[in-house]
């Protein structure tokens, strides 16, 4: 008659150990920072960007969802306010060395629900490193406005047309937009309405 061999206690994984594995945070490829800019009450003589505030830097999937669910939704901000998500260490300003020679892809929306969806899809694509040219991406800005909301994807090397077109095509697919256009930061510094350099 066969008998079962005794099982050593050390061979049985403890419930606590299993729970620890489940609770371990899922690290992202890099750190990201949320920024907030409220221009709803502009003051005369105050430089652009003076109301820009760094909010939170995160590096795990769990932190991202916690911040997004509680705070960073375009529907939760007032008109003329901006939310930004940029790679940690890069400020959402033209003057930042990583942004100085770059530009931005822009998509517009006349409905808040659309902006919310496009914003979330873009955030997930960025933190999930879904772009082949992810090293050329700085971050994204959601601008809530009275007449038309705007989403802008900032990149580093505006003159690298191949990289920008690759990013543009991918982003257009991600947010399901009909048309998006790309402008250089240098043009935006000189003209209020910078012309589009690339379009997809």
Curated annotation (Swiss-Prot):
This is Eukaryotic translation initiation factor isoform 4E. Component of the protein complex eIF4F, which is involved in the recognition of the mRNA cap, ATP-dependent unwinding of 5'-terminal secondary structure and recruitment of mRNA to the ribosome. Recognizes and binds the 7-methylguanosine-containing mRNA cap during an early step in the initiation of protein synthesis and facilitates ribosome binding by inducing the unwinding of the mRNAs secondary structures. Key component of recessive resistance to potyviruses. (Microbial infection) Susceptibility host factor required for viral infection by recruiting viral RNAs to the host ribosomal complex via an interaction with viral genome-linked protein (VPg). It comes from Solanum lycopersicum. The keyword Protein transport does not apply. Displayed sequence is from cv. Heinz 1706 and cv. Ailsa Craig, and is associated with susceptibility to cucumber mosaic virus (CMV), tobacco mosaic virus (TMV) and plum pox virus (PPV). Keywords: Cytoplasm, Disulfide bond, Initiation factor, Nucleus, Protein biosynthesis, RNA-binding, Translation regulation. The lineage of its organism: Eukaryota, Viridiplantae, Streptophyta, Embryophyta, Tracheophyta. EIF4F is a multi-subunit complex, the composition of which varies with external and internal environmental conditions. It is composed of at least EIF4A, EIF4E and EIF4G. EIF4E is also known to interact with other partners. In higher plants two isoforms of EIF4F have been identified, named isoform EIF4F and isoform EIF(iso)4F. Isoform EIF4F has subunits p220 and p26, whereas isoform EIF(iso)4F has subunits p82 and p28. InterPro entries: TIF_eIF4e-like, TIF_eIF_4E, TIF_eIF_4E_CS. Belongs to the eukaryotic initiation factor 4E family. Changing residue 87 to R: In strain: cv. Zhongshu 5. One of its GO terms (cellular component) is nucleus. One of its GO terms (molecular function) is translation initiation factor activity. It is found in: Cytoplasm; Nucleus. GO terms for biological process: negative regulation of defense response to virus; regulation of translation; response to virus; translational initiation.
